[in-house]
């Protein structure tokens, strides 16, 4: 029998200390990594529940194990809630992550060697959309589309390539693209060339749920997403689909790609989907976009170039070449000031992927802790102050103190 008094602090103080230090870091640092956010205590409670003990291969009502009557309730809640949230005909909530969700789509509709289209990683796409080192690039034949001279998606190029190569699958979505995507236009193109149209909305899902970013569901055959990032749930994946594709996708997820689902994570997803359907979530996402715009405008005013000229969403890329600084250097020096971001390639970046000429910034996490436009402007000035004088320890210390003052006013967890 387990004694509930034997907490982690008692049984593994070394691990406990690492977790406590991470908790402190999250409170003390301004989080600007666009793919990160903070989950609610309710989501963490579900994810830390005894549902982690239960194996449940299969789907609600059709399991390969007994004793699934209560995890069936949890999974069905997640399915019903996410369908309602996005207006989807069918949903699978079992993918362990966004990459797994994307792989399931490939497994369902493509054979090795088949041609598909996705956005170039070098111009803002995601590695699962055809990167040479990824399964999608190794096993299939990717045709990449990119950006035009204004650093916006080149739809004419996309249309030309699709008509030439006749891909079996067209993917829309990105990991570092700040503008709105014309899902309707791409959906019409996919129908014209006879392709399955898949949207990876991992970055934009929370904004989509709140109606502040275009919803791809009416236009796409398949929509994949993570459940963290802007959606503010646990780390995991989902697949939304037209009803006609439900059997193929469900079979691809299980038994095609995965075995037992993570029922404690699925419970966390269900909790997050309920939160995302509440009125306050729409207000939150409106603020996410407002904060991103305020941050971008501040950085532009301070002499930094934003790729694509600004943002329509939660994310932006900052071109650092005018500062004679790499993304790697900027990530490090901003980290010293307790501002967390990630180095990121800019379109056609001359630097290596682990160096880069830019950084990616996002507003979801800082908005969760209560920042509004005034604080976003402050953060933009903090960043510019650091990048204007990155080699002065006193300057870094001054900004770090300002960050500490701001984060104390806006705790993540009260």
From Swiss-Prot:
Site (Plays an important role in substrate specificity): 228
Enzyme nomenclature, EC number: 2.1.2.1
Residues holding (6S)-5,6,7,8-tetrahydrofolate: 121, 125-127
An MF annotation (GO) of this entry: pyridoxal phosphate binding
GO CC term, one of those recorded: cytosol
Major localization listed first in the record, in broad terms: cytoplasm
InterPro entries per the UniProt record, alphabetical: PyrdxlP-dep_Trfase, PyrdxlP-dep_Trfase_major, PyrdxlP-dep_Trfase_small, Ser_HO-MeTrfase, Ser_HO-MeTrfase-like, Ser_HO-MeTrfase_PLP_BS, SHMT-like_dom
Positions bearing N6-(pyridoxal phosphate)lysine: 229
Keyword terms of this UniProt record: Amino-acid biosynthesis, Cytoplasm, One-carbon metabolism, Pyridoxal phosphate, Transferase
Keyword Transferase found: yes
Highest taxon in the source lineage: Bacteria
A GO biological-process term: tetrahydrofolate interconversion
Catalyzed reactions: (6R)-5,10-methylene-5,6,7,8-tetrahydrofolate + glycine + H2O = (6S)-5,6,7,8-tetrahydrofolate + L-serine
Cofactor requirements of the protein: pyridoxal 5'-phosphate
Coiled coil: none
CDD domains: SHMT
Cell compartments where the protein resides: Cytoplasm
Pathway this chain belongs to: One-carbon metabolism; tetrahydrofolate interconversion; Amino-acid biosynthesis; glycine biosynthesis; glycine from L-serine: step 1/1
Family stated for the protein in its record: Belongs to the SHMT family.
Function: Catalyzes the reversible interconversion of serine and glycine with tetrahydrofolate (THF) serving as the one-carbon carrier. This reaction serves as the major source of one-carbon groups required for the biosynthesis of purines, thymidylate, methionine, and other important biomolecules. Also exhibits THF-independent aldolase activity toward beta-hydroxyamino acids, producing glycine and aldehydes, via a retro-aldol mechanism.
Subunit structure: Homodimer.
Name of the protein this chain belongs to: Serine hydroxymethyltransferase
């Amino acid at each position: 029998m387990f004694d509930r008094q034997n907490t982690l602090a008692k049984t593994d103080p070394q691990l406990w200390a690492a977790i406590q230090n991470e908790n402190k870091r999250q409170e003390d640092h301004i989080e600007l990594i666009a793919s990160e956010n903070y989950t609610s205590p309710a989501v963490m409670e579900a994810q830390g529940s005894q549902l982690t003990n239960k194996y449940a291969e299969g789907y609600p009502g059709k399991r390969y194990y007994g004793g699934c009557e209560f995890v069936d309730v949890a999974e069905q809640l997640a399915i019903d809630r996410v369908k309602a949230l996005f207006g989807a005909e069918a949903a699978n909530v079992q993918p362990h992550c966004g990459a797994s969700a994307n792989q399931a789509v490939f497994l369902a509709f493509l054979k090795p060697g088949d041609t598909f289209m996705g956005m170039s990683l070098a111009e803002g796409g995601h590695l699962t959309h055809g990167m040479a080192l990824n399964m999608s690039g190794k096993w299939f034949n990717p045709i990449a589309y990119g950006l035009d001279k204004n650093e916006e998606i080149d739809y004419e190029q996309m249309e030309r390539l699709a008509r030439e190569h006749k891909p079996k699958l067209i993917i829309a979505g990105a990991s570092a693209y700040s503008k709105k995507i014309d899902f309707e236009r791409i959906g019409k193109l996919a129908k014209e060339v006879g392709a399955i149209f898949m949207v990876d909305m991992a970055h934009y899902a929370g904004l989509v749920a709140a109606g502040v970013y275009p919803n791809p569901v009416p236009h796409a055959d398949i929509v994949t997403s993570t459940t963290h990032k802007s959606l503010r749930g646990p780390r995991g994946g989902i697949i939304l689909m037209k009803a006609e594709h439900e059997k193929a996708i469900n079979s691809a997820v299980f038994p095609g790609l995965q075995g037992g689902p993570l029922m404690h994570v699925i419970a966390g997803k269900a909790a997050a989907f309920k939160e995302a359907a509440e009125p306050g979530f729409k207000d939150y996402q409106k603020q996410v976009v407002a904060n991103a715009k305020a941050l971008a405008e501040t950085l532009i005013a301070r002499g930094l170039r934003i790729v694509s000229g600004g943002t329509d969403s939660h994310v932006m890329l900052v071109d650092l070449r005018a500062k004679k600084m790499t993304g790697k250097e900027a990530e490090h020096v901003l980290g010293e000031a307790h501002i967390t971001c990630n180095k990121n390639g800019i379109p056609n970046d001359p630097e290596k992927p682990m160096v880069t000429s830019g950084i990616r910034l996002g507003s979801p996490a800082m908005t969760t802790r209560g920042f509004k436009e005034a604080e976003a402007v402050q953060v933009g000035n903090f960043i510019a102050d650091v990048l204007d004088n990155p080699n002065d320890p006193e300057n870094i210390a001054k900004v770090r103190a300002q960050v500490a003052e701001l984060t104390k006013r806006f705790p993540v967890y009260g």
